[in-house]
Structures are given as structure tokens and as C-alpha cells.
Amino acid sequence: MDEQKKEYEKLKKKLRDALVQKKQLEAKWNSLEQEVYDKETEYLSQKPSSRMGNILLGFQGFNKSSSAQQILSDHSHSSNAQPLDDNDRIFSLSSYLFAKQLAASNHQEQTKSND
């Protein structure tokens, strides 16, 4: 009986340690996801001086030949800053947890707008 109790206590301690480690890993995971989200936001909202585009949204400005067209393009885009679309977030959306949180927040917004 004493042997079983020792084994039980040993397993209980192992479980406690595993739960602590799980919490630490989840915190680190959340931190990494937030970092990816922030970097992605920075990249998607970047306003490069060349206005050539980026790998996610395309290179529409790449073939513009004259600097006059570039200046006009820059001026017209500067006042029409479009909000970021969550569908453009290919890295964040690849995370199951981010996609789940996004769906939940969209559901909450729809519920609030219906009230």
C-alpha cells in the first residue's frame, strides 16, 4: 500500500510539473503569435517610397515607368489608406488559435451590430 501511495505522489508531482510547463509553453506560444501578427501588420501597412508593392498584395506599381506617375500614384494613395483585411494575413491565419479567435471576435461584432 505504501508503494502505491509513493507512486501516486510521484505521478501527481509529475502532472503538476507538466501543467506548469504547459502554461509556460502556452504563454511563449501566445507571445510568438502576437509577434508574428505585429510583424505582419507592419509589413502589410508599409508604405514603401517606391510603391512597387509587396509579395502578399501584388506588384501593381512595378511597371510604372515615369517618376511623374509615381508621384501622382503616391499622392492618390496617401489619402486613401485602406484598412488591413484579415484575409491578407496568411501567416496569422495559418494558426488555428488565431483563426479561432478571429472567428469569435467577428461573431461578437455581428451580435453587437444586430442588437
UniProtKB/Swiss-Prot annotation:
Localization annotation: Nucleus
Protein family: Belongs to the EAF6 family.
UniProt keyword list: Chromatin regulator, Coiled coil, DNA damage, DNA repair, Nucleus, Transcription, Transcription regulation
The protein's name in its UniProt record: Chromatin modification-related protein EAF6
GO CC annotations, alphabetized: histone acetyltransferase complex; nucleus
GO terms under biological process: chromatin organization; DNA repair
Protein purpose: Component of the NuA4 histone acetyltransferase complex which is involved in transcriptional activation of selected genes principally by acetylation of nucleosomal histone H4 and H2A. The NuA4 complex is also involved in DNA repair.
InterPro entries on file: Eaf6 (IPR015418)
Tree of life domain: Eukaryota
Subunit-structure text: Component of the NuA4 histone acetyltransferase complex.
Recorded coiled-coil stretches: 1-43
Pfam families assigned: NuA4
